[in-house]
Every structure is written in C-alpha cells, then in structure tokens.
Amino acid sequence: MKYLLIATSLLYTLIQTQETVKPVRTGTHSITIQWISFNKFTPGKVFIKKTGDDEYSIQGEQRDRKSNEYVTIKGTFLNRGRILKFNGKIVSKINTINGGQPCELNGLSIFKASGKRQYWRLQQMLNCDGQTTDYIDIYF
C-alpha cells in the first residue's frame, strides 16, 4: 500500500508538471550574443511561429552593421517549459573570435532558462575556436 501511494503521488506530480508548461508566445522576440550586445543593448529579432502541439519554428538574427558581426538562427524547437529542444542551424561570426570565420552549429541543441531568468540560453556555449564561450539568448 505504501508503494502504491508513492507511485500515485509521483504520477500526480508528473501530470501536474506536464500541465504547467506554458505555450511560447508567438511573434517577435529578442535574440542576443554578448559580443555584439556588450556595453549596449541592441538585440536582434527572431520570429517564432507555432507549427504543432508544443512545436514551433524560429528564424532571425542579431547583426552589427558597422562590424558585420552577427548571430543567425533558423530551425524548429519543442517547448518543454524552461527548456527548448532546438533542431536547426545557428551561425555566429565575431571578428576577434575563430579567426573571424563563421562558427556553425547544426542539429540538436538545448536552450534553457535557469532560475528566474527571462530568457533561454543556448547550452552548447563553446565557440568553434574551442576556447571561447558564447552566450546566445532568446528572450521570452
């Protein structure tokens, strides 16, 4: 009986957790990479569109027209609340990193909103140069 109560309690918690996943707001959101936004807040824009149950498409960029530095994103994601399971392509180009060459990330990636943050941060933070950390954020 004790184990039945524990199992029932866990199942109830799991169901409640799944029900509390809020839909992602569709439309325009801000995107940043810290190298372009450092000392100024000039976010880029992404457009998010619902394509199915908890499924969305995303496309957009942040670009500095003076330096031609940028981050672009195009793909789809599954909404898991504070975690987005992204599948697609992210390209960043910062003149002082990776020899000024674009860094391309393809396939499955995770964005996560930790604590009270109001944005999802890309969890695969290592740039193609193998030593630089990029913070790519998509704001709620």
Annotated model-derived regions:
Residues 50-97:
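Mature extracytoplasmic domains of secretory-pathway proteins
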Residues 45-49, 72-79, 106-113:
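Hydrophobic/aromatic beta-strand elements that line small-molecule binding cavities or substrate pockets
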Residues 5-16:
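Hydrophobic h-region of N-terminal signal peptides that target proteins for export
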Residues 86-115:
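An anionic, turn-rich surface loop/hairpin at beta-sheet edges
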Residues 19-49, 58-62, 118-126, 132, ...:
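Tryptophan-anchored aromatic micro-motifs
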Residues 71-74, 78-83, 123-140:
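Edge beta-strand at a domain terminus
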Residues 79-84, 113-119:
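Edge/loop elements at the starts and ends of beta-strands within beta-rich repeat scaffolds
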Residues 68-71, 95-104, 130-136:
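A short, polar/proline- and glycine-enriched secondary-structure boundary/capping micro-motif
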